[in-house]
């Protein structure tokens, strides 16, 4: 490894070319897409320990998009909160920055219960901790049992 220069000199022509795309990106990111009357909670220290309004919103949106009975979203895929006030496209990308897709599949009642037992008993403070929509359940971690 040989370091020829501490810094690569800027190329004014390249900067000019890239500025056009940067400006277009900035305009898209700053577009207002909504307004909130309260905070949508997605802070890692909260969403990986308990159900939140943002987790429910995302799970519900995915449930509706898939026309499913329930929606489940892993907390690790939610990366930020959205504060009260105007919401921009950038805010949306900050909370959900991955190129994930919504998956839909059919399960028997037993398969669903088996799946929920596995998901519900994942360690809190883990990205696997699930946010739910369309179901209500209680998890007894001491007994390692799920009640729906």
Can you name each region flagged by the protein language model?
Residues 1-31, 121-131, 139-144:
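Active-site-adjacent helix-turn-beta-strand microarchitecture at beta-sheet edges
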Residues 1, 36-42, 91-98:
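Short acidic (Asp/Glu) and glycine-rich catalytic loops that position anionic groups and cofactors
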Residues 29-47:
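A short, surface-exposed helix-loop junction/capping segment
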Residues 11-14, 18, 22, 29, ...:
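Generic structural signal for well-ordered, non-membrane alpha-helical segments
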Residues 43-52, 100-103:
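Second-shell loop/turn segments in exported
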């Amino acid at each position: 490894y040989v370091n020829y220069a501490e810094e690569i000199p800027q190329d004014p022509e390249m900067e000019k070319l890239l500025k056009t795309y940067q400006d277009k990106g900035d305009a898209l990111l700053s577009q207002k897409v909504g307004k909130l009357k309260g905070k949508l909670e997605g802070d890692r220290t909260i969403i990986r320990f308990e159900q939140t309004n943002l987790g429910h919103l995302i799970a519900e949106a995915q449930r509706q998009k898939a026309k499913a009975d329930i929606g489940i979203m892993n907390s690790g895929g939610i990366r930020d909160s959205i504060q009260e006030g105007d919401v921009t496209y950038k805010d949306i990308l900050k909370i959900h920055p991955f190129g994930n897709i919504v998956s839909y599949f059919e399960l028997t009642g037993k398969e669903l219960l088996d799946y929920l037992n596995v998901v519900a008993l994942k360690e809190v403070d883990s990205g696997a901790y699930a946010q739910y929509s369309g179901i209500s359940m209680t998890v007894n971690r001491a007994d390692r049992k799920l009640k729906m």
